[in-house]
């Protein structure tokens, strides 16, 4: 019995399953990292918390109006008793919409208004300092990693010198000198107090990133695309900022996410030690004022400490998540 050939009708052919060719879309390392980050629930919670603090800092004037509180102090003769303790608001006199977080002893300032504007001061100083330190560190790291010979050695020596200096002692000595030298008038005093704090934080915040960028550049400069760019005569500046810098975005983003909480903590600590903008509310200055009243009026201290704690924890956890997203090998 032989094999009979079969004929397929057009209908049979139409019924055959067809293979649909689907294009395989490639994803960049940045897209892969963002996908990992979106799937991390803790990272999303921390990101929401950080964004909430940012919105509070931006809209602090509107929020004070919405709650009906004022930044300027109240009347101590009406709102404080004979011992300069509050007569309204929690924790001793119950909740009041006139002072949801109570008022401060001795000055009768509204604690909620001070907290809202303190978030603005702390976040603005930390953000500007982080950006300035990142700019300095990336630039110096690029130059040190791409150069050869004496320039690389000089830059490494400068980095070692800065790392060997005691940060706190130098900051306590340098900031008052800058303020006393340039803050001659009351109008200039506040500006130079703000500037001196930025200078101190930025001056000692770039070294770690510079070394990180230098190490990455030492590896990248031997790659084929960099060698090809040098052979065809591409200018050095274009190689640094158009070829190398885009390949360094991952470690730079990780460094920013981990450096920002450190600057928030440093700003609060320096304000507590007297280095800050006098007359402008900040969490550190509020903590400085509240420490003597810890036993008798603890709410005055709890509010700014809680703000610093929540923001720093959220930023640290978000920074860890960003690092794990860009480098899964570091995941715990």
Report each predicted region and the residues it spans.
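Glycine-rich helix-loop "coupling/hinge" segments at transmembrane-helix boundaries
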Residues: 175-178, 265-307
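Extracellular/periplasmic helix-loop junction at the C-terminal end of a transmembrane helix
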Residues: 59-84, 170-172, 176-186, 271-273, ...
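Residue-level recognition of transmembrane alpha-helices
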Residues: 50, 114, 156, 172, ...
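Transmembrane alpha-helix boundary and packing residues in multipass membrane permease domains
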Residues: 53, 142, 172-176, 201, ...
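Gly/Trp-centered helix-boundary motif
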Residues: 1-134, 138, 142-143, 150, ...
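Generic hydrophobic transmembrane alpha-helix motif, especially the helices
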Residues: 98-104, 132-137, 145-146, 151-217, ...
């Amino acid at each position: 019995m032989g094999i009979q050939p079969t004929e397929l009708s057009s209908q049979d052919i139409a019924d055959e399953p067809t293979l649909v060719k689907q294009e395989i879309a490639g994803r960049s390392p940045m897209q892969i990292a963002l996908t990992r980050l979106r799937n991390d629930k803790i990272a999303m919670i921390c990101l929401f918390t950080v964004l909430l603090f940012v919105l509070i800092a931006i809209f602090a004037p509107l929020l004070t109006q919405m709650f009906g509180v004022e930044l300027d102090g109240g009347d101590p003769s009406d709102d404080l008793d004979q011992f300069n303790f509050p007569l309204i608001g929690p924790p001793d006199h119950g909740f009041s919409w006139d002072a949801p977080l109570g008022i401060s002893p001795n000055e009768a300032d509204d604690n909620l208004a001070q907290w809202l504007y303190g978030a603005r001061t702390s976040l603005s100083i930390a953000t500007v300092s982080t950006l300035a330190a990142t700019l300095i560190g990336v630039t110096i790291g690029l130059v040190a990693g791409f150069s050869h010979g004496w320039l690389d050695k000089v830059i490494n020596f400068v980095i070692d010198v800065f790392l060997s200096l005691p940060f706190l002692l130098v900051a306590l000595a340098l900031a008052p000198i800058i303020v006393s030298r340039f803050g001659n008038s009351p109008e200039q005093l506040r500006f130079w107090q703000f500037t001196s704090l930025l200078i101190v934080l930025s001056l000692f915040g770039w070294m770690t990133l510079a070394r990180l960028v230098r190490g990455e550049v030492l590896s990248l400069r031997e790659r084929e695309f960099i060698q090809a760019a040098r052979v065809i005569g591409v200018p050095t500046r274009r190689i640094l900022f158009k070829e190398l810098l885009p390949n360094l975005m991952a470690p730079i983003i990780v460094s920013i996410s981990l450096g920002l909480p450190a600057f928030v903590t440093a700003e609060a600590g320096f304000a507590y030690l007297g280095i800050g903008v006098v007359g402008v509310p900040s969490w550190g200055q509020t903590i400085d004022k509240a420490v003597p009243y810890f036993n008798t009026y603890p709410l005055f201290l709890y509010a700014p400490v809680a703000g610093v704690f929540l923001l720093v924890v959220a930023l640290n956890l978000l920074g860890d998540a960003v690092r794990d997203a860009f480098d899964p090998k570091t995941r715990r």
